[in-house]
Amino acid sequence: MKNQLIDRLTRYTTIDTQSDPKSTTTPSTEKQWDLLHLLEKELQQLGLPTDLDENGYLFATLESNIDVDVPTVGFLAHVDTSPDFNASNVKPQIIENYDGKPYKLGNTKRVLDPKVFPELNSLVGHTLMVTDGTSLLGADDKAGIVEIMEAICYLQEHPEIKHGTIRIGFTPDEEIGRGPHKFDVDRFNADFAYTMDGSQYGELQYESFNAAEAVITCHGVNVHPGSAKNAMVNAIRLGEQFDSLLPDSEVPERTEGYEGFYHLMNFEGTVEKATLQYIIRDHDKKQFELRKKRILEIRDDINAHFENYPVKVDISDQYFNMAEKILPLPHIIDIPKRVFAKLDIPANTEPIRGGTDGSQLSFMGLPTPNIFTGCGNFHGPYEYASIDVMEKAVQVIIGIVEDIAENH
């Protein structure tokens, strides 16, 4: 199976599907259609009925081969790649039998070094796909697409493997937070699903952050600095004051595990107007609400010193901790846990310090945990995929549909 995985991942990663947060269309970029149309064709060649809508959501079905009713399971992956780094002219490189030493990426000065990326030490002996140092790889999430496609191929080649109805979904714009926005849960018609969008071997994730964005707008009064006393209000300094009143220890670079944070993503302005953009994250719903409350309290504290209330705050929720919807349905986690145990894969159920499409889909009526893909260092030139771990991910997909047929 390794050769098929390499071939398919190479073909998919060389198609530029970078999404664009500034776009207002869905998909956000026309080039995502290139991979969507290819996948539609390949699924049809496998004999699967497909449904590609005007928003770039590609669904397909592998029909049940058993006579009893069992839950319909879905497998999801996203076609877009991150806008954080160059995604054009991707030239995948193959490292056979990785020796654990630093590896120079193409003709660049970039080096994939285990001292910097210690998770590479667990991949000694693996076949790796890496970049040439000039682009990201796009294994996030094309590795997930590959794993789903190869699992479907295997199931069709082995009809003796019993399974219920399987739904497949390939979606746009996950990297810019819009993946589920036009996802039709009723049309997808699955009882539950799994995103193949994790990273390291053994990840089984069903807890995510609660997430919100806060935009703080500070309005100043700009007068000539030579006559500014008691007249000027510097919006930049208001923004600095606002940020200084947030806990200095509760930022991404000083937190881990279940610890939440405030993250100042952007700060720009002039004396007359300054804007701060934060993301707010916490696994605990009560703490999440308290974080949002703290933002409003800081606004009020600053505004109390002015007559015209110069600081405005706009807070919008982005997604919530999917554990709230998944934990009441323990079988959705028990199924992959049994499969992991059967395959001798140690399950890592640490919470996601982020979100997936499943974070939103779970609150839309489709409970959706996340499973490893075998890739790492997403969104940049040091991205890699372990073909060996990808093969295990394919086995997990096959094991899940077998388990559902046997135990439900």
From Swiss-Prot:
User: Where does this protein hold Zn(2+) 1?
Assistant: 78, 140, 197
The active site annotation covers 80, 174
What are the boundaries of the region Disordered? 1-28
Q: What's the catalysed reaction?
A: Release of the N-terminal residue from a tripeptide
Q: Which UniProt keywords apply?
A: Aminopeptidase, Cytoplasm, Hydrolase, Metal-binding, Metalloprotease, Protease, Zinc
Q: Upper lineage ranks?
A: Bacteria, Bacillati, Bacillota, Bacilli, Bacillales
PANTHER family per the UniProt record, alphabetical: PEPTIDASE T
A GO molecular function assigned to this protein is: tripeptide aminopeptidase activity
Query: Which major enzyme category is it?
Result: hydrolase
Q: Give the highest taxon in the source lineage.
A: Bacteria
Give the PROSITE patterns listed for this entry.
Answer: ARGE_DAPE_CPG2_1 (PS00758), ARGE_DAPE_CPG2_2 (PS00759)
> GO cellular component terms?
cytosol
According to its UniProt record, where is this protein located? Cytoplasm
* Name listed for the protein in its UniProt record: Peptidase T
